[in-house]
């Protein structure tokens, strides 16, 4: 007979997970219905002052799509929603992200980061 299973059976089981700190206390919730802190005039849920959801939703109309009206002088670009206007750059404006200061530019991925990404984050 192999001694290992016997030795394992004699020792008490010790879980491998160690929880830090003490147990969290159980929170006692109120058993009676109380007023919500944001409720107006101390209204309780289900009271006669509350409006049922079905009655509240009667006031809402379903969403309706309204087509965009284009101006007549737009010409060929009437199908677009925005129009490009060629103008000179103003103060603190840039024409490209490559004109940004070095601290705001995108940093290229180095070989170490690339290997970590390709391996799925495993080392």
Curated annotation (Swiss-Prot):
Upon deletion of the gene, what happens?
A: Decreases OGDH activity in vitro without destabilizing the catalytic subunits.
Q: Where is the transit peptide?
A: 1-8
Which GO MF terms does the UniProt record name?
structural constituent of ribosome
Superkingdom field: Eukaryota
Does the keyword section mention Nucleotidyltransferase?
A: no
Q: Which GO terms describe its cellular component?
A: mitochondrial ribosome; mitochondrion; oxoglutarate dehydrogenase complex
Q: Name one GO biological process term.
A: 2-oxoglutarate metabolic process
Magnesium among keywords: no
Disulphide-bonded residues? none
Q: Tell me the compartments it is located in.
A: Mitochondrion
* Keywords of this entry: Mitochondrion, Transit peptide
Subunit field text: Component of the 2-oxoglutarate dehydrogenase complex (OGDC), also called alpha-ketoglutarate dehydrogenase (KGDH) complex. The copmplex is composed of the catalytic subunits OGDH (2-oxoglutarate dehydrogenase KGD1; also called E1 subunit), DLST (dihydrolipoamide succinyltransferase KGD2; also called E2 subunit) and DLD (dihydrolipoamide dehydrogenase LPD1; also called E3 subunit), and the assembly factor KGD4. Within OGDC, interacts (via N-terminus) with E3 subunit and (via C-terminus) with the complex core formed by E1 and E2 subunits.
Against PANTHER family, the record matches this protein to:
28S RIBOSOMAL PROTEIN S36, MITOCHONDRIAL, ALPHA-KETOGLUTARATE DEHYDROGENASE COMPONENT 4
User: What role does this protein play?
Assistant: Molecular adapter that is necessary to a form a stable 2-oxoglutarate dehydrogenase enzyme complex (OGDC). Required for incorporation of the E3 subunit (LPD1) into the E1-E2 core (KGD1-KGD2) of mitochondrial OGDC, and acting as a stability factor for the fully assembled complex.
Q: Member of which family?
A: Belongs to the alpha-ketoglutarate dehydrogenase component 4 family.
The miscellaneous comment for this protein is:
Present with 2050 molecules/cell in log phase SD medium.
What name does this protein carry? Answer: Alpha-ketoglutarate dehydrogenase subunit 4, mitochondrial
User: What organism does this protein naturally occur in?
Assistant: Saccharomyces cerevisiae (strain ATCC 204508 / S288c)
């Amino acid at each position: 007979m192999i001694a290992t299973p016997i030795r394992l059976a004699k020792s008490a089981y010790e879980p491998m997970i160690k929880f830090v700190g003490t147990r969290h206390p159980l929170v006692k919730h109120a058993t009676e219905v109380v007023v919500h802190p944001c409720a107006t005039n101390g209204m309780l849920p289900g009271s006669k002052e509350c409006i049922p959801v079905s009655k509240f939703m009667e006031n809402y109309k379903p969403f309706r799509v309204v087509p965009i009206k284009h101006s007549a002088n737009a010409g060929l670009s009437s199908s677009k929603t925005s129009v490009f206007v060629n103008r000179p750059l103003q103060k603190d404006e840039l024409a490209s992200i490559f004109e940004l200061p070095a601290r705001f530019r995108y940093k290229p991925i180095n070989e170490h980061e690339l290997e970590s990404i390709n391996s799925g984050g495993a080392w």
